[in-house]
Regions:
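An amphipathic, aromatic/His-enriched active-site/gating alpha helix that lines ligand/cofactor pockets
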Residues: 1-20, 57-72, 90-129
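Short, conserved secondary-structure transition motifs
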Residues: 21-23, 77-82, 122-133
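Short acidic, gly/pro-rich beta-turn/loop elements at beta-sheet edges
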Residues: 26, 50-52, 97-99, 135
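Conserved small-residue-rich
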Residues: 34-78
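Surface-exposed beta-loop interaction hotspot
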Residues: 8-49
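Short, low-order "capping/linker" segments at domain edges
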Residues: 25-34, 127-141
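Short, well-ordered beta-strand segments in beta-rich or mixed alpha/beta enzyme
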Residues: 1-2, 34-43, 75-105, 139-141
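Generic detector of short alpha-helix boundary/capping microenvironments
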Residues: 28, 56, 75-77, 113, ...
Length: 141
């Protein structure tokens, strides 16, 4: 199913990409947990997609068990020859993201192999603030 988006008159849509979920998400609900969500866009060769999915699946239990983090979704471009993937991961905060750059050995091996199969990657970190989490934020104003 395609979703139609509307934009203000002064916003121009330059391109769109359709993706299908792979192993996750397990549910298709809007995310509501406050924290850091990193959107990691991958360019890959189409014949590497299945191995990247398997490597991710193998690494996630150890990775998630070692840090306050949870993989939200791994998506693949909805074409016959996919060359783009999107990984979305939740982190409690940026400190956890920084700590997770040094995962346990078995997760690290899978991530290193996944990196070898990746032509390039562009991670974008975002923060989701929910009204109930406002009291936990520190203002530097």
């Amino acid at each position: 199913t395609q979703t139609s988006l509307s934009f203000p008159d002064d916003v121009q849509l330059l391109s769109t990409h359709l993706f299908n979920p792979t192993l996750r998400p397990l549910d298709h609900q809007a995310r509501t947990r406050a924290g850091i969500y990193v959107f990691r866009w991958f360019s890959v060769l189409p014949d590497a997609v299945d191995e990247i999915i398997q490597l991710s699946y193998n690494a996630w239990p150890t990775f998630e068990g070692s840090f306050e983090t949870e993989v939200q979704g791994l998506f693949v471009e909805a074409t016959g020859q996919p060359s783009e993937m999107l990984l979305i991961t939740w982190y409690k905060n940026l400190s956890v993201w920084e700590e997770s750059r040094h995962p346990p050995e078995n997760a690290r091996e899978s991530f290193l192999r996944r990196h070898q199969l990746t032509l390039n990657a562009k991670p974008i970190a975002t923060m989701l603030n929910m009204p109930e989490s406002q009291s936990q934020l520190v203002s530097h104003a």
